[in-house]
Amino acid sequence: ARDIDIPLAQRHFYYHAGMAQLMESELPDAAALGVCGQVIPWNFPLLMLAWKVAPALAMGNTVVLKPAEYTSLTALLFADICGQAGVPKGVVNIVTGNGAVGEMIVSAEVDKVAFTGSTAVGRRIRGATAGSGKALSLELGGKSPYIVFDDADLDSAVEGLVDAIWFNKGQVCCAGSRLLVHEPVADLFYAKLRARMDKLRIGSPLDKSIDVGAIVDPKQLASITTLVAANTAGTTHVAPCDLPVEG
């Protein structure tokens, strides 16, 4: 929140506020779409909101946004700030709830649907909007390979991998969750990686000196635990750590 979510959200609103002033000169033939239905995930609550809301408002649209169940308070606080800033009622609308509420937004009489989330849900939204005339934008999760060649600076590559896969506790749609290493340096790289993993600090995400904080909710913890337990192929390295009892 301190290093990414809040500062980047501020920059997005600043940028699109400038675009709003240049719309007539830079986009003379563009017109507002109308009502934009938007659904966002929980990994960057304010930044995901900014990506959806800022450009839509800048181009003269109104929005109906559904935040993730786990991070609704951020969006509700944003709505309160909009009211304090004088944004007219009905321009920014926040609706909370589970996936069924997201389906309501997709099926409603909106002019555009914007979704950030899983590929499986994105496919369902694409099918639901096909032939409807609604504009659609999808930003879907995937597997990003992290590739290490034999001429790489291995120490720097290890640090880069740590950032790629454990930044925000790995809760990033483009996290480097696949590692491909050139065979001549594979054993040395794996040894350096294991040593670095053993030094990762676990604790409160509010502590800036911590490497890995809490994930979003118990369901995610159970899912991750199941994936780790099911990974019996090949060599497995489990870095020792003391997990917090609470929080």
Where are these regions (language model features)?
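Short intrinsically disordered, low-complexity coil segments enriched in acidic
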Residues: 1-9, 29, 33-35, 247
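A general structural motif at alpha-helix termini
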Residues: 3-6, 96, 109, 161, ...
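ALDH superfamily catalytic-core signature
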Residues: 112, 120-247
